[in-house]
């Protein structure tokens, strides 16, 4: 139980953290202010406020993660007319806060919280402000109306004590070029593909190499029909009962289809050909003789093998998606419960199985996130493409409606898949 839980949390944490970091990295490279980078959902169990204005958090529920960008959704701190605040301005002005305001007055921090006290802060009753374009704040200070310039990177301490940076238009998501928006949205899936490839490369090194497709035997297990028949590592099986076997798949097909009958193997050994007789036995549900295929153990063979396995996994996922579209069924989908079960199986099987599961799930997440469904990365990229074609973005109201439709759809699907996983795990 504990082993399964730890494995699940590690796999989930790595996949989500890498995915969200892809969004964060491209957003920052595009000049977009990242409010928060979160792994998990729900209440925070860890938080760190970085100097660049990004809050890094780990949250208690392993149900996903997110990157909150400035200008995305409900991002603004509401300040009411007449609201009390305290301002920290440039040091030269703090000495005499009643002096005439000048252009050099720069506000660094704006405190709206009654629970936070700032040293040498100027009290103000706010009457007007603009933190997006003109960057100023105006209000009553010691009985006079004062207007202060606000620093581009100034922070606001909200009523609950949370300190956030203001977001001028130039650092908001909407102000980024459409290409940079697309990179920001594609960054998550891209990182999942990279993680999947790296995990498969690690797996090839752990396994000692990449399975070769040739008809050469890599290893013969002792006490098996092949061992008793005299087969050795390095032998090439050229034919089975007269049927040519050009690669390993041909060899496996002929042996597994024998139904336990004696086979005549034409073997090439050290340039010489000989025929050996072997009778397959049923092992783990199929007929086998106890031979293993040879491995490519070169450094670059292992590297390229990781790429090949990643490509094969992606192909298998696309085939599964095609089957799902042709014949929709919840049994073909899996949510957190199914992933938890797979994590338990991988933990019991050992480290290679854990790495394999990590690779498969990462590539799976990358592909699924590119579906053109609002709220998923693919849906956001579609909106970016529409913006590129139209020459302007959809209004925030329209984008919000489209996103809400996607949220409802994904929420209903999530509940249905999770319930089906529970029934499959505990009822069936």
UniProtKB/Swiss-Prot annotation:
Residues that bind Zn(2+): 19, 23
GO biological process: proteolysis
Cofactor: Zn(2+)
Entry EC number(s): 3.4.24.-
Alphabetically ordered keywords of this record: Cell membrane, Hydrolase, Membrane, Metal-binding, Metalloprotease, Protease, Transmembrane, Transmembrane helix, Zinc
Residue ranges annotated for the PDZ domain, each copy included: 188-282
Localization annotation: Cell membrane
MF GO annotations: metal ion binding; metalloendopeptidase activity
GO cellular component: plasma membrane
Pfam families: PDZ_6, Peptidase_M50
UniProt membrane topology term: Multi-pass membrane protein
Active site: 20
TM spans (from-to): 188-210, 354-376, 401-423
Key word Transmembrane helix present: yes
Record's keyword annotation contains Coiled coil: no
PANTHER family reported in the protein's UniProt record: MEMBRANE METALLOPROTEASE ARASP2, CHLOROPLASTIC-RELATED, REGULATOR OF SIGMA-E PROTEASE RSEP
Cited NCBIfam families: RIP metalloprotease RseP
Protein family per UniProt: Belongs to the peptidase M50B family.
Protein name: Putative zinc metalloprotease LL2128
Species whose genome carries this gene: Lactococcus lactis subsp. lactis (strain IL1403) (Streptococcus lactis)
């Amino acid at each position: 139980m504990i082993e399964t839980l730890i494995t699940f949390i590690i796999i989930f944490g790595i996949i989500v953290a890498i995915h969200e970091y892809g969004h964060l990295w491209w957003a920052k490279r595009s000049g977009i202010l990242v409010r928060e980078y979160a792994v998990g959902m729900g209440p925070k169990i860890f938080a760190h406020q970085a100097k660049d204005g990004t809050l890094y958090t780990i949250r208690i529920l392993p149900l996903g993660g997110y990157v909150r960008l400035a200008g995305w959704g409900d991002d603004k701190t509401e300040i009411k007319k007449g609201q009390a605040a305290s301002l920290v301005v440039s040091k030269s002005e703090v000495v005499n806060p009643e002096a005439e305001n000048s252009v050099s007055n720069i506000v660094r921090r704006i405190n709206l919280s009654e629970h936070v006290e700032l040293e040498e802060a100027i009290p103000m009753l706010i009457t007007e402000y603009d933190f997006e374009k003109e960057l100023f704040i105006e209000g009553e200070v010691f009985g006079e109306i004062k207007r202060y310039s606000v620093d581009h990177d100034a922070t606001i301490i909200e009523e609950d004590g949370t300190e956030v940076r203001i977001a001028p238009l130039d650092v908001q998501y909407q102000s980024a070029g459409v290409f940079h928006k697309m990179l920001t949205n594609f960054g998550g899936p891209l990182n999942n593909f990279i993680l999947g490839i790296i995990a498969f490369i690690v797996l090839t090194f752990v396994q000692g190499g990449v399975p070769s497709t040739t008809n050469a035997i890599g290893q013969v297990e002792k006490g098996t029909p092949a061992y008793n028949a005299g087969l050795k590592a390095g032998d090439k099986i050229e034919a089975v009962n007269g049927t040519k076997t050009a690669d390993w798949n041909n060899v496996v097909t002929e042996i597994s289809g024998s139904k336990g009958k004696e086979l005549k193997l034409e073997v090439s050994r050290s340039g010489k050909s000989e025929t050996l007789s072997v009778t397959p036995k049923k092992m783990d549900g199929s007929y086998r003789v106890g031979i293993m295929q040879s491995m490519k153990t070169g450094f670059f063979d292992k590297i390229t093998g990781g790429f090949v396995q990643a490509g094969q996994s992606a192909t298998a996922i696309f085939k599964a998606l095609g089957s799902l579209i042709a014949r929709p069924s919840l049994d073909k989908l899996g949510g957190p419960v199914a992933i938890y079960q797979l994590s338990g199986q991988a933990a019991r099987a050992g480290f290679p199985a854990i790495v394999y599961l990590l690779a498969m799930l990462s590539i799976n997440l990358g592909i699924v996130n590119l579906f053109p469904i609002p709220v998923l990365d693919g849906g956001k990229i579609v909106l970016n493409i529409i913006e590129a074609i139209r020459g302007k973005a959809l209004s925030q109201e329209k984008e919000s409606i489209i996103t809400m439709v996607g949220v409802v759809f994904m929420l209903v699907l999530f509940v249905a898949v999770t319930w089906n996983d529970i029934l499959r795990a505990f009822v069936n």
